Amino acid sequence: TIYKVKNVRTLNDFAHKLTGKIQIGLEYLLNRSGPMSMAPSQLGAFVRSDPAMATPDLQYHVQPLSLPAFGEPLHSFSAFTASVCNLRPHSRGTVQITSADPFAKPHIAPHYLSAEADRVVAAKAIRMTRKIVSQAPLAEHVTDEFLPGADHQSDEELIAKAGDISTTIFHPVGTAKMGNDSQAVVNDRLKVHGISGLRVADASVMPTITS
């Protein structure tokens, strides 16, 4: 979720001015401090989408910046981003080889939000973010909900928008299943079925996200 803000300076403001870029560069060069010395997310939180849950199922990554998509320039307006991750998604995708050529790209179908439970959590996460942002002292600085937009109110609208703006957090697991069935990639010794001398020893063999 992206919110436009007022009376505060975000990285968007620095990035779109030459003086701002110089200030960021000098601060790091002279003091090893400032935006260039930090991770993008300055604030985090673990929360429950349902109070009845024993442990949190959502994780917040809040950044003092906003952008259209990863790799693109920051927005020209002042804003912050509250990214929410579903820690235990139910949706399941596929990764399939497309050729005997080891350099050929695989076909990846993530099927995000294909499970009803994930769609429910997505809508709850946006509503929870709105509730947090509506509280003082944040509320006095927020001028507009840029994404998904205040006009999106129903669960159906929020879920549809979540599908449009959602992205991975770059830590995929479970893409090379361990087991002995036809869908398994490795056995219990991490050896790849049908290929000698090859093992997979990372989180891709884990059946579920360890969070």
Can you annotate each of these PLM segments?
Residues 4:
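Metal-dependent nuclease catalytic cores in nucleic-acid-processing enzymes
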Residues 14-211:
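FAD-dependent oxidoreductase catalytic-site/capping-region signature
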